[in-house]
């Protein structure tokens, strides 16, 4: 979410927050905090979500930062739409993910954490696009944000903006309806 904030602070970028979350909750039946509100707020139809995310960038922006969670792609869905994007995987150490996730919701199994799905997604993106997705560790961004954001921007052939390093404290209109449950730390950052 902090990465989404970083990109949202650019003047040329529109962000969307976890567009497949309602689909995931609907499909799996998992009882996450605010589940019914999420399902009411977003489409639960895979095709509608794909149509949205491959459509025109809203507000005539040049960049569309889409925050996805790998485990929201449940099983076997067609993800050929990744060919329209510059793909990037943000990874975190399992210990950090487990601690963070468990504070918000019970862990039903390894699939909740997304590691197996990340490996599969990495391979699928390579097969569909012909190139490996850009992968970086969240710890690197936290340790030296400017250095790693510059590396990322260079890789994606976009200009780095110092605005990516700071953002106003508080929630955003672009935050998912689930933000009160999951985003406390980033809202206060």
Question: Where are these predicted regions, by residue range?
Answer:
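PAPS-dependent sulfotransferase catalytic core
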Residues: 1-58
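Short, flexible loop segments at the rims of nucleotide/cofactor-binding pockets, characterized by
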Residues: 38-44, 66-67, 111-112
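Glycine-rich phosphate-binding loop used to anchor ATP phosphates in small-molecule kinases
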Residues: 52-77
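Small-residue-rich helix-loop
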Residues: 168-169
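Short, well-ordered alpha-helix to beta-strand connector turns
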Residues: 10, 61, 84-85
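PAPS-dependent sulfotransferase catalytic domain
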Residues: 69-163, 175-187
């Amino acid at each position: 979410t902090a990465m989404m904030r970083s990109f949202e602070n650019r003047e040329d970028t529109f962000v969307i927050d976890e567009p497949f979350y309602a689909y995931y909750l609907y499909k799996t039946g998992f009882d996450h905090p605010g589940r019914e509100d999420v399902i009411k707020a977003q489409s639960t139809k895979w095709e509608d979500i794909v149509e949205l995310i491959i459509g025109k960038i809203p507000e005539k922006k040049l960049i569309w930062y889409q925050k996805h969670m790998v485990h929201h792609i449940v099983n076997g869905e067609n993800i050929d739409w990744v060919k329209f994007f510059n793909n990037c995987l943000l990874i975190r150490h399992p210990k950090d993910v487990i601690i963070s996730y468990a504070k918000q919701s019970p862990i039903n199994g390894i699939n909740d954490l997304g590691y197996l799905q990340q490996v599969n997604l990495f391979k699928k993106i390579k097969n569909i696009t012909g190139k490996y997705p850009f992968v970086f560790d969240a710890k690197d961004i936290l340790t030296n944000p400017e250095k790693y954001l510059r590396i990322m921007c260079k890789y994606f052939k976009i200009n780095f903006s110092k605005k990516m390093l700071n953002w106003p404290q508080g929630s955003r209109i672009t935050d998912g309806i689930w933000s009160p449950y999951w985003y406390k730390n980033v809202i206060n950052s």
